[in-house]
Amino acid sequence: MLDVESAKEILSTAQGSISKEHYVKDKDLFYIIFTSGSTGKPKGVCITYNNLNNFLHWYTGYYDEKEELVFLGHPPFSFDLSVMSLWPSIYLGASLVQIDKKHQENFKLMFEELNKSNATIWISTPSFIEMCFIDKNFNQSLMPKVKQFVFCGEKLFSTTVAKIHENFGDAQVINTYGPTESTVMVTWVEITKELNAKYYENLPVGEVKWGTKVHLADPDEEGKGEIVITGNTVAKGYFKNDAITNEKFGLGEIDGKEERSYLTGDLGYFKDGMLFCEGRIDFQVKLHGHRIELEDIDNNLLKNKKIRQAATVPSYEEGKVKSLVSFVIYNQEIEKRFEVTKQIKQELKKLVPEYMIPKKIVFLDEMPLNNNGKIDKKKLKELV
């Protein structure tokens, strides 16, 4: 093991022997993260040194370098959410505790690790923390030093925020938004109790970072359109895939300076100076002539206090959407599923039109999660 002085000596020797022409340059490729898409074939997103540097300058500005920071991450390093814990911890000289898959699959082991972690900054998908809330021991007593929960990668629901406020005292809840193609995230907002109550239906993802501009392409009469990101964290494109790069990426302008742009495929709108995201445009389905946002159904199902988690998927027949199926985790023992299903549908009918009521409700003990900690929609579709 090297001590600090030995490491400094090695670094100074190495630095002196390398010509400046070999230093990493702003536009040099720094890392590639593969992301799946509608085609099912992963695409390698090319992030430059400049992309990451600009992200870090902005993101780490929310923290005090003098504080003893311990980032806690759960996603594998192949998932872009890990960028929010790995690189900031190095940049700030902070610590990083990584919960590996083996521990995630065993609550006893995972909770032991969480308790020992001394984590101050929690970073995860909303689905991952919902999984943790299955155990009543998941609270401030387990992690007394945690002061901030940061979420990205999925829609954050008000019910999840309320659980955190209830179980973790004064800890901040931060909602963010951004695709892999723009170096993880480009927005930030603290969801206070007041904000959570005000925007219960759809929480804001926050104000847009400096060096970035967001506009909405082809907005409808309500001002909702596809989110387009222009700025200094937008990637070079997809690795060895010029066709899709040219389709999704382009050039924009910020303060007279040319910057990369990216078409996200996400539906959004602005309100009160903040960006709101309504999910993937391709998560919308058309059923009997009605266009339906599936996450809207989930959001309304969660207004039922007996439902802890919900995820709705379409059921297809001959390539067309024939009905909707909602998977739910129920908070109580179920004796008569037919009666409970009927009650859930009756409650939902008070909130949404008839055409948005799922034909079938499936009860699960827990939601299947993919390797990135998100609800595995493909697995749910297989269960339909």
Tell me the role of every PLM-derived stretch.
Residues 1, 94-117, 123-131, 155-156, ...:
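ATP-dependent adenylate-forming carboxylate-activation enzymes
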Residues 1-22, 52, 172-175, 190-384:
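AMP-dependent adenylate-forming
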Residues 17-34, 65-71, 77:
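Conserved pre-ATP/AMP-binding loop-to-beta segment of ANL
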Residues 30, 46, 70-72, 78, ...:
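Short, well-ordered beta-strand segments
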Residues 32-45:
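Conserved adenylation A10 loop of the ANL superfamily
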Residues 38, 93, 153, 231, ...:
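Conserved G/P- and acidic residue-centered "switch" motifs that form tight phosphate/ATP-binding loops
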Residues 43-72, 80-120:
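Conserved AMP-binding/adenylation subdomain of ANL enzymes
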Residues 91-94, 119-123, 133-200, 204:
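Gly/Ser/Thr-rich phosphate-binding loop
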